[in-house]
């Protein structure tokens, strides 16, 4: 356990990197503009280099290339300053471990398996035949319905809900208000009304998955909706039924993924993206915020953007320049057409 105050040499002994200057003690990570003498900050983007000279930070995490410009400052030199900053921040904010015990107001149904190492909070509910791994934290008002299986050290924050029959891997974290395994939007038209199709699948989340607040992942119609290991999904995201999301993909807030979409691994999907259903998105695809994805993306590594229609990012950027000039261009086009028409009339 790292102490609340630690030296640069202690940090580098734990995380690697090279410290330069004085082996000072620091207490927390802060932005360059806010940092004081007891804080450590970081420079990940060269455009903020000028802020380093004005910063009161006691120490700064920089790349080897940037370090040469900051002689006299206390530094930690790292290959990836942003990643290193994240790891230092984790040192000062360690993961909270479960305090074993079940709150008197919690309900644990018969047949549920709850190891003594688990923490079950006030008014939490554990359904019949559900199995929890070691060290789980099911916090106040969280619900795990019947026949679920949770791996070790899963965290359900207050008011998170996991519907029946779902499976969560190890070290999964579900934030407040998220719902895992609600019914998918499956309906058949019966001539004068809609007939609901029973959603008999479930949801399976891999290891190290994190789901943001008020995000919904619908259960599959017949087979499971799945999310791969290490994938991180932001707040207020909708994942439709039967979706298959690969490993280590990130999806930002307010994105809607329609039913039966397959998303590869290591994809980056920006905020406010919307997709049609029944398409495939290849591995390592990057989709810019607000993009409408209307067809499959079959080539790995593409960077796409565009409100409508979606296109290659470079093509969209070029076209976007002209959007604000469309009215002017239309007037010029009409003028040219009129001039051409007048020219023909005089011939």
From Swiss-Prot:
CDD domains: LbH_LpxD. This is UDP-3-O-acylglucosamine N-acyltransferase. The lineage of its organism: Bacteria, Pseudomonadati, Pseudomonadota, Betaproteobacteria, Neisseriales. PANTHER family: UDP-3-O-ACYLGLUCOSAMINE N-ACYLTRANSFERASE, UDP-3-O-ACYLGLUCOSAMINE N-ACYLTRANSFERASE 1, MITOCHONDRIAL-RELATED. GO terms for cellular component: membrane. Belongs to the transferase hexapeptide repeat family. LpxD subfamily. GO terms for biological process: lipid A biosynthetic process. It catalyses: a UDP-3-O-[(3R)-3-hydroxyacyl]-alpha-D-glucosamine + a (3R)-hydroxyacyl-[ACP] = a UDP-2-N,3-O-bis[(3R)-3-hydroxyacyl]-alpha-D-glucosamine + holo-[ACP] + H(+). Pathway: Bacterial outer membrane biogenesis; LPS lipid A biosynthesis. It comes from Neisseria gonorrhoeae (strain ATCC 700825 / FA 1090). Catalyzes the N-acylation of UDP-3-O-acylglucosamine using 3-hydroxyacyl-ACP as the acyl donor. Is involved in the biosynthesis of lipid A, a phosphorylated glycolipid that anchors the lipopolysaccharide to the outer membrane of the cell. Pfam families: Hexapep, LpxD. Homotrimer. NCBIfam families: lipid_A_lpxD (TIGR01853), PRK00892.1 (NF002060). Keywords: Acyltransferase, Lipid A biosynthesis, Lipid biosynthesis, Lipid metabolism, Repeat, Transferase.
